Amino acid sequence: MNKFIYETMYILRPDMTEEKVEQAITKYKSMLEEQGAYDIKIQHRGKLRLAYEINNQREGIYIQMNYQGPPTQIAILERAMRLSEEVIRYLTVKQELPKTPETDTQKNLEPAVALAE
């Protein structure tokens, strides 16, 4: 099974207090941990101006999470964000882990051994 690196960027309402923002970050981080995610890195980007108005908001609090884990965790996380009134936008992208040079070298050697026989 391939392992993937995921990045989820979500935008919280700008009128949330710092305490509520921290609660939201903790909630989504613990949700990922419960689903088997690991190597979770969170970056609090702060309050930034939106490119366009979303739900009558011109600013938002940007949070970025980078993590690894099973693909099933994404649907659960995004469903929770979709139902939450504190999240105004979210996006998750995935990237396949790069293959180690060791495995590429082994693949190249196998056909040569087969041809030599």
UniProtKB/Swiss-Prot annotation:
GO terms for cellular component: cytoplasm; ribonucleoprotein complex; ribosome. InterPro entries: Ribosomal_bS6, Ribosomal_bS6_sf, Ribosomal_S6_plastid/chlpt, Transl_elong_EF1B/ribsomal_bS6. CDD domains: bS6_chloro_cyano. The keyword Translocase does not apply. One of its GO terms (molecular function) is small ribosomal subunit rRNA binding. Belongs to the bacterial ribosomal protein bS6 family. Binds together with bS18 to 16S ribosomal RNA. This is Small ribosomal subunit protein bS6.
